C-alpha cells in the first residue's frame, strides 16, 4: 500500500485535545450512520480492504469535511475506508480498525463492527454498510495515499428506476411532505419519494427514444425551451452516480426526480407556455394545448395525490380540454433507493436532508 507521512492528530484532525478528537471520530461515524451510503470495494486483500463512497455534502457534514478544491467536486464528499485487523488491538472476530479519509484531508480512526447489507445480489462490489460498537482509536502515523488507489470507471450495474418503484396510494398523512417537482413529493414520515408516473402503454406514442415516465420529466420536455438555459444544461453537473460510486451522472441521475419545468423550478411560475416537444401533449391532455397551469401553490398547500387533475390543467384558452387522467398513476420509490437518489443529487440533498418536516 503506497503511503505518505502525515501527523494526523495535528494536520488532519482539527487542533483539539485528544478527548475532542475522539469525539469527532465517533460523531463523524454517527453522521455516516444517519445515511444510507453505498460503499464500493476497490481492493480486497488478505489483510486490507479498501472501499469508497461518494455522497453529497450537506450542512450536517460541513463540520467534519473540508470541501474539495476541484470546482466539479466541491459539493461532494469522497470517503475512502481502510479496513484492517491489527493484532495489537485484540479485536473480536467481527471488529475492524477503520480509517476514514474524507476528501483526502480529514482522517478519522475508529474500531467498529460492520453491518453489511447487499441491496441487489450477493457478491456485488457495492453494499450498504452501517457501523456499530464504535470506539475511537489511535490513527497510524503513516496513512494511505488515496491518489494511488485505482478508481472504478464503469458501473456495477445500470439502474432502472422503474424496476424499483411500487404502485401505491397516498400515505395516511399526505400533507406531511414537500414538493420536489411537479407531481413529485418527499414524504417526511415515509422517508421516500412519491410521484406520478405514466402508464407504460403510453410510451408507444411518445417521441422516439423517450423512456422517462415521471410527470416531472415529461412536463419538462413538453414545456421547456428546447435549447435550454444554463441551469437546465448543467443537470448532469449536479449529479453523481452514488450507487456505482462514479464521478458521473449515471442512469439514476439522468432519471432523477429533481427534473421539472424550468420556470417553475427557478421562479415558481404556475402558468407556463409550451415551448418544448409538443408531441408529448397527447400523453398529458386529451387534445393539443399551448399552455399549462399548475394547480397547487407549494407556498400554501402541498399534498401527495394520485390524480393528475389535482396537479395540472390546460392553460388559459384551453380550459375545456381535460387532462389524460387515466394515463397516470401514483408510485413510490422505496426508502433505500430514495436515499441513494438523494445522495447523488445536490438539489435533493438540500431539499430533503436540510429541511425540517411539517408539523401536522
Curated annotation (Swiss-Prot):
What would be one Gene Ontology cellular-component term for the protein? host cell cytoplasm
Q: What is its main location?
A: virion
The record's keywords, sorted A to Z, are: Host cytoplasm, Host nucleus, Late protein, Virion, Virion tegument
Query: Which InterPro entries does the record match to this protein?
Result: Herpes_UL16/UL94 (IPR004286)
Does Metal-binding appear among the keywords?
Answer: no
Q: What does this protein do?
A: Plays a critical role in cytoplasmic virus egress. Participates in the final step of tegumentation and envelope acquisition within the host cytoplasm by directly interacting with the capsid. Upon virion binding to target cell, a signaling cascade is triggered to disrupt the interaction with the capsid, thereby preparing capsid uncoating.
The name under which this protein is listed is Cytoplasmic envelopment protein 2
Name the source organism. Gallid herpesvirus 2 (strain Chicken/Md5/ATCC VR-987)
Q: What is the lineage of its organism?
A: Viruses, Duplodnaviria, Heunggongvirae, Peploviricota, Herviviricetes
What gene is behind this protein? Answer: MDV028
Amino acid at each position: 500500500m503506497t503511503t505518505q507521512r502525515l501527523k494526523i492528530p495535528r494536520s488532519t484532525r482539527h487542533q483539539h485535545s485528544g478527548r475532542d478528537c475522539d469525539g469527532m471520530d465517533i460523531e463523524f461515524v454517527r453522521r455516516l450512520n444517519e445515511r444510507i451510503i453505498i460503499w464500493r470495494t476497490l481492493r480486497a486483500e488478505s489483510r486490507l480492504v479498501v472501499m469508497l463512497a461518494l455522497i453529497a455534502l450537506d450542512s450536517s457534514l460541513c463540520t467534519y469535511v473540508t470541501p474539495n478544491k476541484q470546482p466539479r467536486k466541491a459539493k461532494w464528499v469522497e470517503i475512502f475506508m481502510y479496513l484492517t485487523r491489527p493484532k495489537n488491538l485484540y479485536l473480536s472476530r467481527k471488529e475492524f480498525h477503520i480509517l476514514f479519509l474524507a476528501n483526502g484531508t480529514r482522517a478519522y480512526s475508529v474500531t467498529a463492527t460492520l453491518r453489511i447489507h447487499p441491496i441487489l445480489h450477493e457478491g456485488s462490489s457495492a453494499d450498504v454498510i452501517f457501523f456499530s460498537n464504535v470506539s475511537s482509536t489511535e490513527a497510524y502515523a503513516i496513512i494511505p495515499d488515496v491518489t494511488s488507489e485505482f478508481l472504478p470507471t464503469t458501473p456495477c450495474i445500470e439502474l432502472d428506476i422503474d424496476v424499483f418503484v411500487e404502485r401505491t396510494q397516498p400515505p395516511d398523512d399526505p400533507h406531511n411532505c414537500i414538493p420536489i417537482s411537479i407531481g413529485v413529493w418527499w414524504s417526511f414520515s415515509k422517508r421516500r419519494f412519491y410521484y406520478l408516473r405514466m402508464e407504460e402503454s403510453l410510451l408507444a406514442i411518445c417521441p422516439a427514444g423517450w423512456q422517462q415516465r415521471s410527470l416531472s420529466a415529461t412536463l419538462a420536455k413538453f414545456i421547456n425551451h428546447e435549447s435550454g438555459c444554463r441551469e437546465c444544461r448543467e443537470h448532469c453537473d449536479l449529479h453523481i452516480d452514488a450507487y456505482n460510486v462514479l464521478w458521473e451522472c449515471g442512469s439514476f441521475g439522468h432519471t432523477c426526480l429533481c427534473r421539472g419545468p424550468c420556470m417553475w423550478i427557478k421562479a415558481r411560475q404556475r402558468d407556463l407556455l409550451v415551448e418544448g416537444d409538443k408531441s408529448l401533449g397527447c400523453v398529458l391532455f386529451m387534445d393539443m394545448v399551448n399552455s399549462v397551469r399548475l394547480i397547487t401553490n407549494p407556498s400554501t398547500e402541498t399534498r401527495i395525490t394520485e390524480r393528475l387533475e389535482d396537479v395540472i390543467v390546460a392553460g388559459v384558452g384551453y380550459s375545456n380540454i381535460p387532462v389524460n387522467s387515466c394515463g397516470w398513476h401514483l408510485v413510490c420509490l422505496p426508502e433505500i433507493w430514495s436515499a441513494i437518489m438523494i445522495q447523488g443529487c445536490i438539489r435533493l440533498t438540500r431539499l430533503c436532508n436540510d429541511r425540517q418536516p411539517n408539523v401536522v
